[in-house]
């Protein structure tokens, strides 16, 4: 492909459009063929070693007859040195000329690329409008990309989406076309909401309108980072979470990101890891607390079970049947209650344990308890008086271990 200064191609595009407009007022296409040639002459006159006079002329001709030849001619001559000329294209050359058009596909693509790089969108639009309706030309990738650029700058977003969704483009054009796709959707979303989009808003737009496969290689991205880039960063982070500025620059070149993006990725990753470690520490502490509580409960259980077994053994060793056992428990409870009352009202008097025992023995014998109850009463009469604290604790333990059948009415003993 020939490389020329941008200003020469501006003139080329303008002259081509003028020639096409002029040709439309002339008689229609002639069977003898339409030949067109674009000649670019560059004459360099070197008058001295310190001054150069450059004269450039651009000629475009469109006429009927003269064969089917056409091409772009670049002639260059120099008076001070050797002369040379470069001729591109020709009537009988290998390039196929478009019907009723003097330029080849390569030349049209070159004009489109130059006008895009120069940012001259208006001239590019006029040049595209002047192209003939030929499938080989209209489906050229450079022409399609130029149409997409013109549609974006004119606000014709539906036409832009149609071009990008229905035509496949090479990977070298994906980045530019992806930017057009996203910017167009951003502009539409901003007009709909009436305010500029932030980072979150743009992320939602990208999720709502994913890139078409015609301009995307299908590789998933995360926060605008491709999986390959993230994999490189993760591998480096596993070895060194704190890369130096030089290492960050190397990573940026390897991943295709900027140094700022690489630095921010490492900062965010370190912050997430610290938060995860803090959360794990809190969970471990709660687990240890619950384990210690369980151990304390387990250490208390044997003593409680031993106490319960001792109470059961005392109940089993008491003589008599079930009624006798219940009466013995009644007698013990009455003794402790009486001792507690005697200490509260008459601390200077001894416990009336003998009277309480006699009353309990009489009541139990009237109920048919037998001699077992009398023996228990006699044993209780011989017991020394108990202190208030010991009596209360013993009463509490006996009441807790007493079955429901052993409950009695304390109103019967109010006279005591």
Curated annotation (Swiss-Prot):
Sequence segments annotated as region (Disordered): 32-91, 262-329
Composition bias type Basic and acidic residues, residue spans: 273-290
SMART domains per UniProt: HOX (SM00389)
Pfam family, one: Homeobox_KN
GO molecular function: DNA-binding transcription factor activity, RNA polymerase II-specific; RNA polymerase II cis-regulatory region sequence-specific DNA binding; sequence-specific DNA binding; transcription coactivator binding; transcription corepressor binding
SUPFAM superfamilies xref list: Homeodomain-like
Entry's transmembrane regions: none
Any GO BP annotation: entrainment of circadian clock
Source superkingdom: Eukaryota
Phenotype upon gene inactivation: Flies specifically display visual defects. These range from reduced ocelli and ommatidia number in weak loss-of-function phenotypes to complete absence of compound eyes and bolwig's organ in more severe lethal phenotypes.
GO cellular component: nucleus; transcription regulator complex
Main location per the UniProt record: nucleus
Tissues where the protein occurs: In developing embryos, expressed in the eye disk epithelium, bolwig's organ and the optic lobe primordium at areas of invagination. In adults, present in photoreceptor cells in the apical regions of the retina, and in optic lobes.
Biased composition (Gly residues): 79-91
Compartment(s) where it occurs, according to its Swiss-Prot or TrEMBL record: Nucleus
Keywords on record: Developmental protein, DNA-binding, Homeobox, Nucleus
Compositionally biased spans, kind Low complexity: 42-57, 291-329
Residue ranges of DNA binding: 218-277
Family: Belongs to the SIX/Sine oculis homeobox family.
UniProt function note: Required for visual system development. May transcriptionally regulate genes necessary for optic lobe invagination and Bolwig's nerve formation.
Protein name: Protein sine oculis
Species of the source: Drosophila melanogaster (Fruit fly)
């Amino acid at each position: 492909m020939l490389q020329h200064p941008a200003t020469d191609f501006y003139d080329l595009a303008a002259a081509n459009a003028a020639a096409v407009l002029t040709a439309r007022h002339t008689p229609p296409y002639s069977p003898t063929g339409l030949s067109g040639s674009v000649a670019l002459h560059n004459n360099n006159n070197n008058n001295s070693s310190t001054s150069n006079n450059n004269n450039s002329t651009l000629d475009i001709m469109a006429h009927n007859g003269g064969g089917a030849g056409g091409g772009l001619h670049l002639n260059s001559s120099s008076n001070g040195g050797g002369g040379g000329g470069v001729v591109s294209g020709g009537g009988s050359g290998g390039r196929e000329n478009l019907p009723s058009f003097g330029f080849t596909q390569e030349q049209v693509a070159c004009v489109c690329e130059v006008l895009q790089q120069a940012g001259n969108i208006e001239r590019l639009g006029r040049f595209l409008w002047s192209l003939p309706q030929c499938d080989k030309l209209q489906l050229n990738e450079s022409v399609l990309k130029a149409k997409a650029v013109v549609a974006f700058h004119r606000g014709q977003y539906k036409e832009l989406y149609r071009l990008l969704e229905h035509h496949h483009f090479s990977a070298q054009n994906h980045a530019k076309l992806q930017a057009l796709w996203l910017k167009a959707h951003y502009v539409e979303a901003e007009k709909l909401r009436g305010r500029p989009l932030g980072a979150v808003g743009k992320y939602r737009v990208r999720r709502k309108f994913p890139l078409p496969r015609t301009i995307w290689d299908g590789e998933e991205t995360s926060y605008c980072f491709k999986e390959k880039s993230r994999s490189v960063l993760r591998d480096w982070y596993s070895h060194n979470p704190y890369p130096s500025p030089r290492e960050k620059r190397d990573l940026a070149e390897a991943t295709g990101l900027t140094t700022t993006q690489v630095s921010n990725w490492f900062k965010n990753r370190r912050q997430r890891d610290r938060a995860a470690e803090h959360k794990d520490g809190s969970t471990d502490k709660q687990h240890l607390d619950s384990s210690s509580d369980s151990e304390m409960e387990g250490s208390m259980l044997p003593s409680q079970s031993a106490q319960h077994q001792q109470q059961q053994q005392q109940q089993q060793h008491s003589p008599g049947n079930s009624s006798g056992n219940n009466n013995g428990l009644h007698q013990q409870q009455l003794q402790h209650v009486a001792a507690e009352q005697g200490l509260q009202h008459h601390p200077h008097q001894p416990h009336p344990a003998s009277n309480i025992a006699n009353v309990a023995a009489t009541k139990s014998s009237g109920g048919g308890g037998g001699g077992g109850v009398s023996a228990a009463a006699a044993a209780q009469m011989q017991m020394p008086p108990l202190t208030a604290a010991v009596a209360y604790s013993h009463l509490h333990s006996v009441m807790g271990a007493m079955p429901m059948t052993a409950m009695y009415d304390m109103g019967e003993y109010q006279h005591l």
